[in-house]
Design a protein with these regions (language model features):
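Bacterial N-terminal signal peptides
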Residues: 12-26
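Boundary at the C-terminal end of the N-terminal hydrophobic targeting segment
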Residues: 25, 31-33
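Short, glycine-/small- and polar/acidic-enriched structural segments
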Residues: 34-186, 190-196, 209-218
Length: 337
């Protein structure tokens, strides 16, 4: 018989204890699975209707089903690019003037997915103004500053309608959409570019819908922006995020009652306004989520209207990378050219 080795006996005992405790070769527990989920931080400028796919993916467990542990962080659109560059967040839930401007200014980031490819805005007027012709020489309010996405979308829509933007006086009004309604009611302006749910309130008060701007202009609303290094080094994770958001968007399209309940709970609207907002919002959704050239070109145009980046010809690939969204769309069964 071989002499007893105290060290060998101690090691064997340790192995037996680990096996008994389920720590060696045991199946993964729920807690361990949670640890292995991809931990991802996504910023959003605010929980508005454009953030609905993001909120649905979180609240309906779609991120979790795709193996992701997602933290949503509210960060102003103007500050999000710096947070992305500094590693404080992994993705920006948006594609708009702020993110595109940051990319064109040197941030190595790309738009990789669109939530909507149209924005839900109506040009509305005071009751006595029944047409665009009636608004000649009158003031039209837009939220924020002139040269922003909604302002440029209005200019494009006016051009498509045969009108000249120079025939109207554009007024930028800071604050929320409700401020535009107040400006209309007080007769400070004769027209205003308004989005849901304020649109519905304005219509009930007798204001006229003159132009459905969203149906006339391709312009991204919501979306996803990521660093180039993330796209290149973590394509599997990026596709999981895109798949989660696209799946949430598909569920939104299919399930009005479920989505209206989410709008009521998260966005604090009443049932009627939530239902009307849903009807308007779902018409803007990008079918596949693949970034399109027309939307990106109109975003660039909105920046150039402010006198920025006018000295260069800007290619789609400088701003967007549609490859992973295309892969996800094909995997989900969409017909992609």
């Amino acid at each position: 018989m071989l002499p007893r080795n105290p060290l060998r006996s101690l090691l064997l005992l340790a192995v037996q204890v680990f096996v008994a405790l389920g720590l060696l070769g045991a199946p993964s527990t729920d807690a361990e699975s949670q640890e292995r989920r991809s931990k991802v931080r996504i910023s959003n400028a605010g929980f508005t209707i454009t953030a609905l796919p993001l909120l649905a993916a979180r609240d309906w467990g779609i991120f979790t089903a795709n193996g992701m542990d997602v933290e949503l962080i509210v960060i102003a659109a103007s500050l999000a690019p710096a947070a992305l560059a500094g590693g404080d967040i992994d993705y920006i839930a948006g594609v708009g003037p702020a993110s595109v401007s940051a990319t064109l200014s040197g941030l190595p980031a790309r738009a990789i997915w669109f939530s909507s490819d149209r924005i839900s805005y109506w040009l509305m007027s005071r009751p006595q103004f029944k047409s665009l012709e009636d608004l000649k020489g009158k003031k039209i309010a837009v939220s924020g500053g002139l040269g922003g996405t909604n302002h440029v979308a209005l200019v494009i829509a006016l051009e498509k309608s045969g009108a000249n933007q120079k025939d109207h006086v554009m007024v930028g009004i800071p604050g929320q959409q409700i401020q535009l309604l107040y400006a209309l009611e007080s007769a400070f302006v004769e027209g205003a570019l308004i989005s849901p749910p304020v649109t519905f309130n304005a219509y009930k008060k007798g204001f006229n819908k003159l132009l459905d701007v969203g149906s006339m202009v391709e312009m991204p609303g919501g979306g996803l922006t990521a660093l180039v290094k993330t796209i290149q080094s973590k394509p599997t994770e990026v596709k999981k995020v895109i798949r989660s958001l696209q799946s949430a968007k598909d569920e939104i399209r299919k399930s009005k009652a479920k989505t209206v309940d989410l709008i009521v709970r998260i966005l604090k609207m009443d049932k009627e306004a939530s239902s009307e907002t849903y009807d308007a919002f779902q018409t803007t959704l990008s079918p596949t989520g693949i970034p399109n050239r027309a939307g990106i070109e109109n975003l660039v145009r909105s920046l150039q209207a402010q006198g920025r980046f006018t000295d260069r010809k800007i290619a789609f690939t400088e701003i967007a990378d549609d490859r992973l969204a295309t892969e996800v769309a094909k995997e989900l069964g969409y017909k992609v050219p």
